[in-house]
Amino acid sequence: MRCRIAESDVELETPLVRAEVGSTLLIGIRAGDILLATVEPAGLSARNIISGRVLSVVQRDVIVVVRVNCGVEMEVHLTLAARDSLQLQPGHAVWLIVKTHSCHLMAAS
């Protein structure tokens, strides 16, 4: 099932749910379930590959919080090692990778 994020062009493939076309759904994605790539990925089973730009990279203890603008603002949690190997900086182009089953229906109306 394809769902458009409100007030954006971003679409996510989510698990099938019983919802009317045009319904409002609240979809939750854990920040730690989002992968980041610095080159456009190919040949993946993940159905959601979204391009964006890094807004900020902030270390909070042993977690790195990366904020990405991909038409909407998304928060991604990385390890220190992942941050270091990706060499992320604000303004860098990235791709967010989200498996369909990492998109959880929280509410529908």
Question: Where are the regions that the model predicts?
Answer:
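Glycine-centered tight beta-turn/hairpin loop motif at sheet-sheet or coil-to-beta transitions
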Residues: 5-10, 69-73
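Conserved active-site beta-strand-loop modules that form the wall/rim of enzyme catalytic pockets
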Residues: 1-3, 23-24
